[in-house]
UniProtKB/Swiss-Prot annotation:
GO molecular function, one term: pyridoxal phosphate binding
Keyword Transferase set for record: yes
This protein's encoding gene: bioF
Organism: Geobacter metallireducens (strain ATCC 53774 / DSM 7210 / GS-15)
Catalyses which reaction(s): 6-carboxyhexanoyl-[ACP] + L-alanine + H(+) = (8S)-8-amino-7-oxononanoate + holo-[ACP] + CO2
Enzyme Commission code: 2.3.1.47
Domain of life: Bacteria
Protein name: 8-amino-7-oxononanoate synthase
Annotated positions of the N6-(pyridoxal phosphate)lysine modification: 237
Pathway(s) of this molecule: Cofactor biosynthesis; biotin biosynthesis
GO biological process, one term: biotin biosynthetic process
Organism phylogeny: Bacteria, Pseudomonadati, Thermodesulfobacteriota, Desulfuromonadia, Geobacterales
Keywords for the protein's UniProt record, in alphabetical order: Biotin biosynthesis, Pyridoxal phosphate, Transferase
Matching Pfam families: Aminotran_1_2 (PF00155)
Quaternary organization: Homodimer.
Amino acid sequence: MSKSFAEELEMLKAQGLHRRMRRIAGSQGSRAVVDGKEALLLCSNNYLGLADHPRLAEAAIRAVERYGTSSGASRLVSGTMELHALLEERIARFKGTGAALVFNSGYAANSGIIPALVGKGDVVFSDRLNHASIVDGCLLSRATMVRYPHNDTAALRRLMERHETAGRRLLVTDGVFSMDGDMAPLRELAALKREFGALLMVDDAHGTGVLGATGRGSAELQGVMAEIDIHMGTLGKALGSFGAYAAASEDVIDYLANKARSFIFSTSLPPAVLAASLAAVDLVDSPDGAALRERLARNTAFFREGLCAAGFDTMGSETQIVPLFVGGAEETMAFTARLLEAGVFAQGIRPPTVPAGTCRLRCTLMATHAEEDLARAVALMAAIGKGMGVI
């Protein structure tokens, strides 16, 4: 080897790009103990506060008592328990599709679904800011990958015109972009998919449970639920559990069950996770879920308005993901460290997750955040930002 792992690690450290894991003690509530210090948690995807909700915990406990701790096998062997079927039926009803299929994670879903749908001779159109799991799914598929400028539907149209003679065409996008907090223009994308005879897949990991009148996500918010061919979403963010799903027509789901390698060759999700997910979907699809979404929306508006009033650039965020632009990697991580020392944990984001020069704090709001805590966080950020010359 030309370079040792130790040498490469030293290079990452010199570039300000070395990462380490911080230890969280206790549950993922609005406050947590981070590396032994209590802090306001502003970087969890537990948007509705369901990760420590008693209904989910009780459902998981009951499932362990009845079904044990493991599914014991992959889904196509003996690993399909009745809870898998019940959860998939519930997700299909929730998303308004013919069927659904549960995967072990969002990464497993995208890296399995996309190569199952397209291959050599096909083309996949992918937003340049799509999640890494979508990019990897496209690469694994061996289809021609065409990346279009972020949310630029005019540029996308030109690219689709160039590939009209391709085999199967797949248009894939995040519903909510995880690092910027903005949304895909799903109405325009749906029109393009109709015009060019493409399939439209939406990864709504950060919209499911949060957006739309009933929490069905960004497609519901934009009025195009029926236009999406493959709804992908996760169970471990707003829904407070673990895993992911695809929701689509019965034929597409049957096809994925037979072709998606990440589904076929993995031991399936355990009973506790399935039961917690079922409880989460029921809760989201209820008046209690609506109340949580309203609280999250209020917290998000309060926090974003406070940052903007202080002079921060929130990078066009439209959702509960609110980035705070800093710029350089070292400055961003210094900002994070100063905040944590003062009792606020907002994770700095650096390359390769975001392009160089666009490093930011990625703040994520919860329904369970208290307004006074958010006000204190904004004041701290403003003081640190002024001291560092960010604002």
